[in-house]
C-alpha cells in the first residue's frame, strides 16, 4: 500500500527530475547543434553556457559517483532513453558505417589533438560514415 510518506517522496523525486538540465526521456540522439546550443564560435566565453557544458557542470556538481538518489534515477532514465534512441538509429543506419571516437572534457577545444580529431571526423563524414560520440556527461 502506498502511504502518504511514499507520495511525498515521489513528489520530491518528480520535482528533482523536472529540474535536471537534460531530458530524461529524450527520444532521439543528440545532434551537434543541440549539444552546442548557446555556443558562439566568435565568443569563446559562450562555451561556458552551452548545453554540453551545463550538463557537464551539473554532473560535476552532483558528483561523478552520485550519492543523491534522485540524481541516480535521472541518470539511469537518461541513459535508458539514449540506449533506446541508439537502437532506433541503428534500424535505419548501417552499423558498419558508424564510427565512434571517445574522448573527454580533459582535452581542451584549443588543443592540437582536438583539431586533428575534428578534421578526421569531418573527412570520415564526407566519405559517408556516421560519427557517433558520447558516453560521458556533458
PLM region descriptions:
Residues 7-10, 14-138:
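Glycine-rich beta-alpha loop segments
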Residues 4:
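Conserved active-site loop/cleft motifs that coordinate metal ions or position small ligands
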